[in-house]
Amino acid sequence: MNLTVITLTSEKKDGKFCFFDEMKKIIEHSKVVIEEGDVLVISSKFISNSQGRILKIEKSKVCEKARKIARKFNTNEKFMEIVYRESDKIVGGVAGFAMATTNGILAPNAGIDKSNSIGTKIILYPNEPYKFAEELKRK
């Protein structure tokens, strides 16, 4: 069995776009041929971005529960409000991170990302990730 890893990149996008059209364009531009049995690994943030799951952190209104969690894990209250709102359950954490489940997936800060976004915007976890993966598989 042979394993070859090929990286495909895209410019950062700011706003909703058609994921499938963009992937088609990226693959065509790279001249990579996707064959039966190939495995695609796609960043959840790229999918979230395509769904428009981007928020401005400064617009968050902080509830008392999120304020307590932010103090406990020594993190920004407005950011923690979004983590709290997006998660199904906060199960623990360490300084700077709350471990949370979202759609049955355990991830730091409910999978919410500040590092791959522009300015004070944050990228949420994708809507219905399992359904999206099935749709991608069919296409």
Language model: regions and residue ranges:
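N-terminal and secondary-structure boundary signal
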Residues: M1-K139
